[in-house]
Amino acid sequence: MCDDDETTALVCDNGSGLVKAGFAGDDAPRAVFPSIVGRPRHQGVMVGMGQKDSYVGDEAQSKRGILTLKYPIEHGIITNWDDMEKIWHHSFYNELRVAPEEHPTLLTEAPLNPKANREKMTQIMFETFNVPAMYVAIQAVLSLYASGRTTGIVLDSGDGVTHNVPIYEGYALPHAIMRLDLAGRDLTDYLMKILTERGYSFVTTAEREIVRDIKEKLCYVALDFENEMGTAASSSSLEKSYELPDGQVITIGNERFRCPETLFQPSFIGMESAGIHETTYNSIMKCDIDIRKDLYANNVLSGGTTMYPGIADRMQKEITALAPSTMKIKIIAPPERKYSVWIGGSILASLSTFQQMWISKQEYDEAGPSIVHRKCF
C-alpha cells in the first residue's frame, strides 16, 4: 500500500451483486459489500432503535428480515441512481473512510453500457462527490489486465450479467461482444425453484440469500451432464447436506450441478440463448480471422459466477469441440477471479502512464459529462 493515503486513487467496481472498493496499488479491495439498499417494510417496528430510513450493504443484509431489499444495478447496468448514490456514499464515507474530493476515482462499467449511463456516472462523481478526477473503465478489460495480458477473450460472469469480451492490444472489440442476461442471480433463483421441487420452500428475499450461500458452497459444473445425472440417480455419492440458520438440515443431490448447468444450457430456465461455450465461440468468430488464434489461447474467466469447481475443464471440453481441431485452446481461471476486475483497476490506476488519462474536474467543467466518451475508451 502506498503510504500517502491522501492522494491515492480510489477504485470502485460496481457489480450487480457486490461492490468492491479500495485503494489503487493494493492487491485486494478493502471493502466488499452487497449492492443493496434496504428500506423498512413497516414504520417503526424497532422502537427506540433509532431506525434509519435506509440501510446499505451488509447492514441491510443483516436486517433483511424487516427490510425490503432493492438492487440498484440490474444486469450490470445502473437503473436506480438515487440508491446508487447511497451506495457510493457508503463506499467512500463508511467503508473506505475517505473524502472523495481528495482522491481521483476509477469506476467500472459493463460492456456496451448506454452512453447516457456513463455521463450520469461522471456527473454524479464530479457534482455530488466533487472528485478531483475520475475515469470509467470496462470491467472485462480490467480482468484481462489483472491476468497480465492485453489480448484475449474474457468471459465475465457476475451476479447480474454475463459477457464475452474479445480484447486486442487493450481495446475491447465492441462488434463482437456477446451479452447474456443470465448470471448468478438467475442461478440462485433457479436453485430456489428446484429445491422447492424437492420439498424445501424458499420464497422471500431473505431466503434467497440462504440459497445463494448453498449455491456458493455446494454447486459445481459437471464435465458430462448426462453421466453425472446417471451417477446421481444410481447412488448417493453426490449428496451433500447443508444446515439452515434455524438448525434444520437439508440434503441436496443433483441440484448441485443442475443449477450451474444452466450456464451451458439456458433452456433450463426457459431462455432461448446459446450457452456460455457457444457465445464464447460466436464472439471469437466475429473477430478478424488473424487474431482468433490469440483469443482461443487466452480465454480468461472472471467474476463470481465463474468460481464453480469444474467450470474451466468443461469450457475447455466444449470449446475444443466447437473450434478447428488443430487449434490450441487454453482456459485461464485465476484463483482471485472473483475480484479480478477490481485488481485490474488497481493496477491500471497506479500506472505512471495512466496518470494523463484521468478526466480532471477542470476538463469536466469545460466540456460537461460528454467528456467521458472522448477520454474513456
Curated annotation (Swiss-Prot):
SMART domains (UniProt xref): ACTIN (SM00268)
Tissue and organ distribution: Predominantly expressed in skeletal muscle. Lower levels in heart, gills and skin.
PTMs per UniProt: Oxidation of Met-46 and Met-49 by MICALs (MICAL1, MICAL2 or MICAL3) to form methionine sulfoxide promotes actin filament depolymerization. MICAL1 and MICAL2 produce the (R)-S-oxide form. The (R)-S-oxide form is reverted by MSRB1 and MSRB2, which promotes actin repolymerization.
Modified residues (N-acetylcysteine): 2
EC number of the protein: 3.6.4.-
GO molecular function: ATP binding; hydrolase activity
Positions bearing N6-methyllysine: 86
Family to which this protein belongs: Belongs to the actin family.
Function text: Actins are highly conserved proteins that are involved in various types of cell motility and are ubiquitously expressed in all eukaryotic cells.
UniProt protein name: Actin, alpha skeletal muscle B
Source species of the chain: Takifugu rubripes (Japanese pufferfish)
Gene: acta1b
